[in-house]
Design a protein with these regions (language model features):
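Well-ordered beta-strand positions
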Residues: 123, 145, 203-207
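Beta-strand-loop-alpha "switch" segments that mediate conformational coupling across diverse proteins
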Residues: 183-184, 196-216
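Walker A/P-loop phosphate-binding motif and the immediately C-terminal alpha-helix
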Residues: 6-55, 117
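Acidic-aromatic/histidine active-site loop/patch
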Residues: 1-10, 71-74, 169-171, 175-177, ...
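Inter-motif core of Ras-like GTPase G domains
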Residues: 116-121, 132-154
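Phosphate-binding loop that captures ATP/GTP phosphates
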Residues: 32-92
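Arginine/glycine-rich "motif VI" loop of SF2 helicases in the C-terminal RecA-like domain
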Residues: 33, 167-175, 198-202
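Cytosolic-facing regulatory segments adjacent to core modules
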Residues: 72-131
Length: 216
């Protein structure tokens, strides 16, 4: 029998905020849609995420609407659709929650939603918060590729090595992680700084994203 379709899950993590995870996730989702793929996007910075803003959503929907139906152990299509935001042809977004205090209740809903999205989408992109609750930890553990994002900030290399250890502890092998140095070429983000970040990460897979300048 043919194995069931399971879309790859690509998760962006970092040990410090402001390094560009959300922008990278939004860009990957947009690019995937241009390639004709159905991209599902989860903003698991559940308390204060702003992916909906980056993706141009005027009226964000509350992902906490999935808490009650998830108690049954399965999410029905109408519930999933009601909590979603159709950003563009091929890009659909879920998250964050409207009331930050509900973030800790999202582990089970996220697990159930991710299971459905892996069957119904071509690719799943996940943005995360610096603080990991159960929902983030479970999503990272389920990822097929984990992007460890950093930049030229002073603490970026040290915090990246710590978040790699955390991802390892939830079951992600280092072979599924990539070191992503963002804004390469910007002021203070030269070859030496990028190499320092990559050495601290000690991952065989390395990616550098060039700085786009002030206009981007």
């Amino acid at each position: 029998a043919a194995s069931p379709h399971r879309a790859p899950v690509i998760c962006a993590i970092s040990g410090s905020g402001g390094c560009g995870k959300s922008t990278i996730v939004a860009t990957m989702a947009h690019t995937s849609s241009l390639l004709g793929l159905r991209a599902a996007v989860l903003d698991l910075d559940l308390m204060f995420g702003n992916l909906y803003d980056l993706l141009g959503v005027d009226a964000p929907r509350d992902m906490a609407a999935l808490i009650e139906p998830s108690a049954a152990g399965v999410l029905a299509e109408p519930d999933i659709v009601a909590a979603s935001m159709r950003v563009a042809p091929g890009v659909t977004l879920w998250g964050p929650v409207a009331a930050p205090e509900q973030a800790e209740l999202m582990a089970r809903p996220v697990e159930l939603l991710l299971d459905v999205l892996r069957r119904e989408s071509d690719v799943v992109f996940i943005d995360t918060s610096v603080f990991w609750g159960d929902a983030v930890a479970a999503a990272v553990a389920a990822s097929d590729r984990c992007l460890v994002v950093g930049d030229a900030a002073v603490s970026s290399a040290t915090s990246a090595s710590r978040v790699i250890e955390l991802a390892s502890r939830v079951g992600v092998p280092r072979t599924r992680m990539s070191a992503v140095f963002n804004r390469f070429g910007a002021r203070g983000a030269d070859e030496d700084v990028a190499m320092r970040f990559e050495i601290a990460c000690a991952l065989s897979s390395k990616i550098r994203i060039a700085d786009g300048g002030q206009d981007l």
